[in-house]
UniProtKB/Swiss-Prot annotation:
The keyword Nucleotide-binding does not apply. The gene is bfr2. Belongs to the AATF family. PANTHER family: AATF PROTEIN APOPTOSIS ANTAGONIZING TRANSCRIPTION FACTOR, PROTEIN AATF. Residues 1-225, 404-430, 537-565 are annotated as: Disordered. This is Protein bfr2. It comes from Aspergillus fumigatus (strain ATCC MYA-4609 / CBS 101355 / FGSC A1100 / Af293). One of its GO terms (biological process) is maturation of SSU-rRNA from tricistronic rRNA transcript (SSU-rRNA, 5.8S rRNA, LSU-rRNA). It comes from the Eukaryota.
Amino acid sequence: MAPKTLAERLAELEDPTPKDFDPEDLERAGPDSDDEGNEAADPNAGREHYQAVGKARLRRQDPINLGKQYAGSKISREALEAESDDDPFRPRSSDEEEDSEDEEEEDSELGSDEDEDASEESEEERPQRSRTSAKDSKRQRKESQVSSDEKDGEGMDTDGSEETEGSEDDSEDGFDEDDMSGEFSSDDDQEGDEDGDDDEDEDEETDNRKVRFQETSKSDDREELRRLMSSDQKTIAATISQAAKADAAKGRAVKQQRATFDALLNARIKLQKGLTAINRLSVTTKGSDETPSIDGEAIKSAESAALALWSTLEDLRLALADAQTQDESKKRKRPSAVSVATSTDSLWKRMTDLESDAVPHRRTVLDKWSLKVRGSTAALPNARGKLLGASASSQQTISAVIDAQVASETGDRAAKRRRHSSDEGPEPVYDDTVFYQSLLRDLVEQRMSSSDAITNGIDTLHLQLPSRQGIHPITGMRKDKVKRDVDTRASKGRKMRFDVHEKLQNFMAPEDRGTWTITAREEFFASLLGKTASGLLREGDDEDASAAEESDEDREEVGLRLFRS
């Protein structure tokens, strides 16, 4: 293409219209200009002899892969403008504003001309022909209006726009013809007036239909949004309420379990004094000739109380067994009530039968809850390269641990009795000191942790109850050898030994705010003790004199020490 001439360049400079370039037009690389001065400068100018080297990794701007959900879609300008036309809040352009102003001016001019024509004419000069033509035009417009109502929203818009344009064209044509010819007939003026009124009414009706259609569509969208939001809120509230109900049920179950455990522990604590008293009872041997004094009434009352307690415990165990069994046919029948005449062997047999039936269920429940409560421990290698988590003690069930604990306790007590007793047989005593102490320790620790009351009670707790250092933390069994924690570096003065004392709390030095002096206090107490002030002062003078004499003697003795060998 030939370069531009000077005249063309001057015309471009004098043209005040700014050049508009579409930024979304990807096919165009830039503004079409053949001017050499507007061309971009070559960045490699003067560097042709350099070796071509790519950008460094830090200077290279690699695109960030955000994923498919962040990828946009390309649309045309027409689709974008079509979407923006539907927006009632979009900004209006200058062309649209000018068109609306022109239409308003034309409508005002037509209305003024029609008013002048109508005032000049009289009703007598209007012929019958204008009336018939007006009626025909009204009838045609009503038919077109009915047909436009049956169509959808888009049809309404197009028909209304065509009718308004047609009416405007007709009015403009009529106005021009009247100006050119200069002849204004009364019939044409009347018809033009009626046509203008009908066109305005139709325009208003079409505008009202559009507004109503837009309002109904917006209201439907809002109702749909409200319905979706309400359904989402109901779903979220239902899930939250279900989770809260489940947590509340778990909390109530745990609270009930703790209350049951506390009640059983309270009963065991109350039985401790009775068990201690029973173990102190003397046991008479079969070959002894001693006949202790027997109180028949006390024995009968104790026997009846023991049988009542035994009956209550048996009823409780039978109720628990029936609750565990769902089948009615497998439920145990209630035996006859015990009495004083019932033999001890029958009582023992009934107890062993109940125990044998309850043992499997008890062991199953204990193992299940022990596995749930026991946390998962990581397998860590020890000094020998073995895994600590793979030990046999961690794989044992709680029922096996309890059996081993009971067996060890029974064996230890039997060995102690054999060492301390004579040739006589073992005394039938009930001894669960270790278990009872563990229960007490758990109870005290729970109370101490729940209430931040007294910290000094922990020290008294360790003094009163035996420590748990000799019990294995997993199996619960006592260790044979307890390794003492001894600091090997503390010998030979390599480590300073000290005791850390607690800080003094709420300490405040005494402050004397009294009005009495020390002399007044001494006189007051001297009068209470029957001494006079003069005697008290005389005693003070004697003490001062003796102290002065002693100080003089000390000085002389110190001076003589210099000459001692």
